[in-house]
Amino acid sequence: MCQAGEDYAGPARREPPPVPRPSREQKCVKCAEGLPVVVIRAGDAFCRVCFKAFYVHKFRAMLGKNRVIFPGEKVLLSWSGGPSSSSMVWQVLEGLSQDSAKRLRFVPGVIYVDEGAACGQSLEDRQKTVAEVKRILENTGFPWHVVALEEVFSLPPSVLCCTSQESAGTEEAYKAAVDRFLQQQQQQQQRVLGAEAGASPAQGEARLHPSHGREPSGTAGYPTAAQTEALSRLFSSIKTLTAKEELLQTLRTHLIVHIARVHGYCKVMTGETCTRLAIKLMTNLALGRGAFLAWDTGFSDERHGDVVLVRPMRDHTLKEVAFYNHLFRVPSVFTPAIDTKAPEKASIHRLMEAFILRLQTLFPSTVSTVYRTSEKLVKAPREGCAAGPSGPSCLLCMCALDIDTADSATAFGAQSSSHLSQMPSAEAGMPTQPCCAAGEGQAQSCHREVGKRGDARACITEQLCYSCRVNMKDLPSLDPLPPYVLAEAQLRSQRGSVSEEIQEYLITDEEEDS
């Protein structure tokens, strides 16, 4: 019978296709012998051994196809405790084991960022989580670093500077690095075997293959109460969950890059999967970051210069990661995120995630289609903008800054026009008569002081990309921002003013020709 509120005009809801279950008669599609234990796609049933080989091959192939990590380099593994990053750490751990067919040739370390203060966790819950994190990291044997997000309030302004590095570049350079690494290993083995000729076999084996855990692990203590209060005040002042998630991601990246530079890491691995990158691509399009998709979703991200972010898990889906972690008992830690228990329409990130996952349920090729589209994006600056190594970059995300004039028909032009129309009149904040007309220097000093008070927000806003400008609108005051952001903004503004003053005294090419 009829029910209140029932919509009869809409189309019938389409039920998702049933998940195929492997039968006893079905065999593995790879070896055609073993009994299948998982079904990745429709008809692709794998046994335990073949699924592990398939999973490991994806990870190794991604590193081999993009030869960004050179032998002997120090690589920092960004571990959040979740399934994807835990699986990434497990892949590196197995790739460095003695019985591995082709051992990985880089030196790993692990970093965990405690974001409990931004997510509203109590101190007791954070201490329990950190204790569990340390227990898992100690079992890996890698050097590990546990840092709190509150440490962003003690970062130097140099974090926001893109330090240039020499291009490692060609295939010949990679082969030469491999040869040097193998020669160093052979020389080290010969020295160890010669020095330990009279030692026991166990001691010689221990010196020949030293444990990664013997390096000192950087463990940060708990932050001060003032830093925790400052971080809580910063995130509580932001109006929307979308801006909170974007700022959290930005601060986390700045902290990880700083730790990598301090400890000599030149690469940072993140555990972003194919599913997560597909959601990120659509989310960034909605946030106005379409010009930076190649950096935000590509295999490597070189925006920080000397520290390169790489994504070796970008060929794995969340389904594959979940199956692998369950079958091989990969340890992980559950930590509530900033959007935990948030409704579907609370932020653009949550809305886009629900949209993509719902489409994936009805159309299983949704994630792969979006992901393959991101692979075709090329890291090229937009024509007519200064996006080279010496060009300006965004103060927060550090991507190339698109600079348009106020009268251009772009989003930047609309924002600039809106800012100019909403600015209060100069007479409202200044006296009717010149307050210091005794000398030119005094008048200039007074004018600069008034401009400093009135345009502090505009000084930072003009150094942001379009997406970061939109997010900063949800922050009523810029005072809660970390000091290194404000200091770098002031330094860039002063450099710009000095550069404009110097340009008045320089002779251009046109003037020289005339």
From Swiss-Prot:
Its localization reads:
Cytoplasm
- Keywords of the record: Acetylation, Cytoplasm, Phosphoprotein, tRNA processing
Gene Ontology terms describing biological process: protein urmylation; tRNA thio-modification; tRNA wobble uridine modification
Source organism superkingdom: Eukaryota
Q: Where are the annotated segments for Disordered?
A: 1-23, 192-222
- Designated name of the protein: Cytoplasmic tRNA 2-thiolation protein 2
Species, as recorded: Mus musculus
Please report which protein family the annotation says this sequence is part of.
Answer: Belongs to the CTU2/NCS2 family.
For this UniProt entry, the molecular function terms from Gene Ontology, in alphabetical order, are:
nucleotidyltransferase activity; tRNA binding
- Major localisation: cytoplasm
Pathway(s) of this molecule: tRNA modification; 5-methoxycarbonylmethyl-2-thiouridine-tRNA biosynthesis
Q: Where is the composition biased (Basic and acidic residues)?
A: 12-23, 206-215
Phosphoserine PTM positions read S421, S425
Checking InterPro entries in the record gives: CTU2, Rossmann-like_a/b/a_fold
GO CC terms of this entry: cytosol; protein-containing complex
Stated role: Plays a central role in 2-thiolation of mcm(5)S(2)U at tRNA wobble positions of tRNA(Lys), tRNA(Glu) and tRNA(Gln). May act by forming a heterodimer with CTU1/ATPBD3 that ligates sulfur from thiocarboxylated URM1 onto the uridine of tRNAs at wobble position.
Modified positions (N-acetylcysteine) in chain numbering: C2
Q: How does it assemble?
A: Component of a complex at least composed of URM1, CTU2/NCS2 and CTU1/ATPBD3.
Q: Which residues form a coiled coil?
A: none
